[in-house]
């Protein structure tokens, strides 16, 4: 079966569970894996967060849970119709469509949670169920050709902003590529700098502009090119706790998405910088750490994803110097410096480890 058929069957199975309970004279109920913090575990072998084995039960015998079950079934039926017709809807559209249901949502946050409940219950991503986020995927520039339906797209000939990653990235086929690595950067300012300086050619690389915190489609794209095309992934973000976090979500996933991290995380991705050591070694322009930065850095030290010596050293060093720096701070030495000097030195150091 293809992905569409699997999704339809799983969505139907949710209704079958209810019908079977009714037929057997039982109170209808649905088992939903718990997404509470006590059931979210960092798996040292997989190197990302996973869900534990705890489940919750939603029962129509509980008056407080009847509406939640109804919302879940209405949403599942809506998704089944979307997938069957090969259509998609945004999470915002789902919220407004529910206005016509007998069990509508109080706000979009409530509808988003039900979408996540479907994900974790069925073991499929919301994108596979036809539900799309509002945010754009990353921009990609480099020698990669993809096929979306019957359309082939060359990421070198898609304009200066490159190919925009589709929300339905699992339906995209990688046709051809002539690159040796992926360089993902946090800001679009740095993305355009690397494109202008032809970093894609100099480093035989796909340049990925993350646009801040990487969207799910972006993380899925990065994982796919890493695993399917065997391309090493390098991440270059701002040198602050937020840049560290953006990189780590790509590498080891997030606790919130523990149920789908196996499809989104790229544990072998490497963080190039900007590190606290870079701030010192390259004498970069800096800003002082704010109180919120210090608090966040101390939180990262307690996070199991940052247990490695590299991360501990860099986080502690940043706390010691009390400074942070942006990617664009390399412009102190000229616009070309980041491509001519910084990236070659960092790539050589990381690739020779």
From Swiss-Prot:
Domain Topo IIA-type catalytic: 2-138
A single GO molecular function term of this UniProt record: DNA topoisomerase type II (double strand cut, ATP-hydrolyzing) activity
Superkingdom of this protein's organism: Archaea
Any one GO CC term of the record: chromosome
InterPro entries found in the cross-reference section: Spo11/TopoVI_A, Spo11/TopoVI_A_N, Spo11/TopoVI_A_sf, Topo_VI_alpha, TopoVI_A, TOPRIM_Topo6A/Spo11, WH-like_DNA-bd_sf
Entry keyword ATP-binding: yes
Keyword ATP-binding: yes
Active site location: 96 (o-(5'-phospho-dna)-tyrosine intermediate)
Catalysis performed (reactions): ATP-dependent breakage, passage and rejoining of double-stranded DNA
Cofactors required: Mg(2+)
Alphabetically ordered keywords of this record: ATP-binding, DNA-binding, Isomerase, Magnesium, Metal-binding, Nucleotide-binding, Topoisomerase
EC number: 5.6.2.2
Amino-acid positions noted as binding Mg(2+) in the UniProt annotation, renumbered to this chain: 186, 238
Alphabetical list of Pfam families matching this protein: TOP6A-Spo11_Toprim, Topo_VI_alpha, TP6A_N
One of the GO BP terms on file: DNA topological change
Quaternary structure annotation from Swiss-Prot or TrEMBL: Homodimer. Heterotetramer of two Top6A and two Top6B chains.
Function comment: Relaxes both positive and negative superturns and exhibits a strong decatenase activity.
Family to which this protein belongs: Belongs to the TOP6A family.
Full protein name: Type 2 DNA topoisomerase 6 subunit A
Naturally occurring in which organism (per UniProt): Methanothermobacter thermautotrophicus (strain ATCC 29096 / DSM 1053 / JCM 10044 / NBRC 100330 / Delta H) (Methanobacterium thermoautotrophicum)
């Amino acid at each position: 079966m293809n992905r569409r058929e699997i999704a339809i069957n799983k969505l139907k199975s949710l209704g079958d569970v209810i019908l079977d309970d009714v037929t057997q004279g039982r109170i209808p109920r649905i088992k939903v894996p718990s997404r509470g913090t006590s059931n979210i575990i960092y798996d040292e072998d997989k190197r990302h967060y996973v869900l534990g084995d705890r489940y919750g039960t939603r029962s129509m015998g509980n008056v407080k849970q009847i509406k939640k079950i109804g919302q879940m079934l209405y949403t599942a039926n809506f998704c089944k119709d979307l997938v069957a017709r090969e259509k998609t809807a945004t999470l915002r559209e789902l919220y407004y469509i529910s206005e016509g249901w007998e069990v509508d949502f109080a706000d979009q946050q409530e509808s988003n949670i039900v979408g996540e409940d479907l994900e974790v219950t069925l073991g499929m991503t919301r994108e596979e169920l036809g539900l799309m986020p509002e945010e754009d995927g990353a921009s990609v520039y480099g020698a990669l050709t993809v096929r979306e339906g019957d359309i082939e797209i060359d990421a070198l000939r898609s304009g200066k902003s490159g190919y925009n990653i589709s929300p339905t990235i699992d339906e995209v086929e990688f046709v051809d590529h002539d690159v040796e690595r992926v360089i993902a950067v946090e800001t679009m300012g740095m993305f355009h700098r690397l494109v202008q300086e032809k970093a894609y050619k100099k480093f035989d690389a796909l340049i990925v502009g993350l646009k801040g915190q990487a969207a799910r489609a972006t993380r899925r794209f990065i994982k796919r090119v890493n695993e399917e095309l065997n391309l090493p992934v390098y991440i270059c973000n701002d040198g602050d706790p937020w840049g560290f976090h953006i990189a780590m979500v790509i590498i080891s996933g997030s606790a919130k998405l523990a149920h789908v991290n196996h499809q989104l995380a790229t544990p072998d991705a490497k963080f190039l910088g900007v590190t606290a050591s870079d701030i010192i070694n390259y004498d970069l322009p800096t800003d002082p750490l704010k109180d919120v930065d210090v608090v966040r850095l101390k939180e990262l030290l307690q996070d199991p994803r940052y247990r490695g010596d590299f991360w501990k050293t860099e986080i502690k060093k940043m706390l010691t110097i009390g400074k942070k720096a942006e990617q664009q701070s390399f412009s102190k030495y000229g616009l070309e410096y980041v491509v001519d000097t910084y990236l070659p030195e960092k790539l050589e150091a990381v690739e020779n480890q």
